[in-house]
A protein has these predicted regions:
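Short, highly charged C-terminal tails/helix-capping segments
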Residues: 39, 141-149
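Short, cysteine-centered beta-strand-loop-beta hairpins and adjacent loop/turn segments enriched
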Residues: 56-62, 113-116
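Hydrophobic ligand-binding cavity/cleft-lining segments
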Residues: 1-46, 139
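Short, surface-exposed coil-to-beta transition loops
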Residues: 3-5, 61-65, 87-91
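Generic structural detector for well-ordered beta-strands
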Residues: 7-11, 38, 54, 67, ...
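Beta-strand/loop substructures that line and gate deep hydrophobic ligand-binding cavities in soluble
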Residues: 80-135
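A short, structured loop/turn motif at beta-sheet edges
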Residues: 14-15, 42, 69-74, 93-104
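Short beta-strand segments that buttress and anchor functional surface loops
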Residues: 49-56, 77-83
């Protein structure tokens, strides 16, 4: 299946948007169903970093780990899940719009299912992710445009 792709324009510079997106200690401020996230060991973000996340899925919380596979400030980052039955593979791109005071953030997201995840990805996960991504990007836009950094 094709990845889920969603974009939003934000009235902030690419540098501001990228910095906020990759500050995982703040990701729960805008990401739908994210309880917490942190870079393992508190190290600076780089290719190979592990990001520990806790997501609310239904009535329970699930822990997962993503590995950073691309990190090109202030333009793009990529990650892949390395544990659990449902593993996300994603890429975020931040592009300047107009004179560079505005940005377009595009997120591409796909999933790899293992075990029961092979059934859940096409039946539930992709639909929920599409909805959550749109809500999250609207929250991101509102947060950054109101001065939240």
């Amino acid at each position: 299946m094709a990845p889920i792709v969603h974009s939003v324009e934000i009235s902030r510079s690419p540098e501001d948007v990228f910095a906020y997106l990759t500050d995982f200690s703040r990701s729960s401020e805008w990401q739908e169903n994210l309880v917490s996230a942190s870079v393992e060991g508190g190290d600076p973000l780089r290719v190979g970093s592990h990001v520990k996340m806790t997501r609310r899925i239904g009535r329970s919380e699930r822990k997962m780990t993503n590995e950073v596979i691309e990190h090109n400030p202030p333009r793009s980052f990529g990650f892949r899940g390395i544990d659990g039955p449902i593993r996300a593979i994603g890429k975020g791109t931040v592009e300047p719009v107009g004179d560079g005071a505005r940005s377009r953030f595009t997120m591409e997201l796909d999933f790899e299912g293992r075990g029961i995840g092979k059934l859940l990805v096409p039946l539930v996960v992709r639909r929920q992710a599409r909805s959550d991504m749109a809500k999250s990007q609207e929250r991101l836009k509102a947060r950054l445009e109101s001065g939240g950094t």
